[in-house]
Amino acid sequence: MLFLMGVLALLLTTPNANADDKEKYKLFAEETRKEVWALKLPEFTNTAIPDKYKDESAVILAAHSRLEITKKTRFNVGAFLGGFHYIDREVNCRDLYRMLVQINDKAALKEFSEFDYKAEIRKKDWRYDENYQQVLGVRIIKPDGTVNEISTDEYMTATEGKKDQEQLQKLAVPGLEIGDKVDIFFFNYTSLENHNLDPFVFRFRQSHPMLSYTVHCEIDDKLTTQYRTLNGAPDFKQSKDENGNILLDVAVKDIEQTEPDLWYNPMQQTPMTLMYITNSKMKKY
């Protein structure tokens, strides 16, 4: 079953025609956070840190990337009457990155105390339609095991871009202290019509040691998927589900080497996988 199908259904329906965009986004964000926190990820229950990392500024206890992409087609009456190609091809993408981080000093506290991101972007013209929404979720896990989810009241919303069409969310994480663990995720929902997705990058090295990194992809087999492993990145285990969707999985443990701040070229040195997913039957004009 595809991840977050309930969230997708929420996006494709309008419970109240008079609800404004901010309320719709707030509901979407709340439902997304519920879905993500409910995911069964065993690696995120591991809180033991090896002695060799005890002096690190921060340790990524677990990280997880999840990518789910579906495709559907529909008849476009307006394009048909106008003499254009009349089959619209829509691609829906759900892209998640989540990590659990141990905060050990002031530098790490500063690094993980503030976040900003673009909540919504909409681009549309006669050739294509693009809708993008992003959700940030943050939880603080205290040394005694207490879990504090950051309330949506702590998020500040600003607008930018042409005619203030792009919403920018900002968050200063309250209550985070040295010795805490912070559970963070970024969830991106992208809907494209007659257009291709940007490439995806899975990085197997970060600025802090990483005890576990897992990647799971579910991709509609009607799309063209190509990927390339670079700099020693591990290859995916490939399979298919009962619906014929392409499944790609990889898991890596104890990534000790980190990316330095100076004299380092990630594209040439960081193990990573570049993935291109294209609508091979995208209409042409």
Which residues does each predicted region cover?
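Beta-strand-rich, non-transmembrane domain signature
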Residues: A19-K284
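Bacterial N-terminal signal peptides
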Residues: L2-L11
